[in-house]
């Protein structure tokens, strides 16, 4: 029997439950997207590979993946940097559940997928931050990273810039629509300025 035949054989109650579940899933993603301004879109394989190459494989400490989506990139980060602790944040319920399942299936001991808004979480122990966010989220994130990240920390961003923060390097992924990947480094001066008493 074909898939269409299987669907046609469902009772009215089963069809209603299936459609209700589908609407709930789509609604959940839509509500979270409207709330955060960031849909759960995965990075393409070419862009993800470029981002990974900008993260030192010998990174120690914490790597934050902000807006983990479905979790695929977070797993790759954990595989690439076994000496690091990868903490991935996701706020959309369904992608979070999938990412959490992927964490379990990958058996990466150095990966932790967390449900929550990274804007309300401290990031001051981050050695590296990776993100694929939209413009509005980057505007809100930039001052938080400036204020919290230790000197020398790296930020790797897919496609979107951090306002008023010149990148150390920009890599254009020609294999996918000339997508830019930005590498930022937290300058020592920013930390010194925040630690210097005024008056």
Identify the role of each PLM range:
Residues 71-75:
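Glycine-rich SAM-binding Motif I of class I
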Residues 107-118:
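Conserved SAM-binding strand-loop segment of SAM-dependent methyltransferases
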Residues 1-58:
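S-adenosyl-L-methionine
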Residues 85-90:
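Conserved SAM-binding motif I beta-strand of class I
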Residues 124-140:
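A short SAM/SAH-binding and catalytic strip from SAM-dependent methyltransferases
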Residues 137-198:
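C-terminal substrate-binding/active-site "lid" region of AdoMet-derived donor-dependent transferases
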Residues 99-100:
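Conserved SAM-binding loop
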Residues 59-69:
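Conserved class I S-adenosyl-L-methionine
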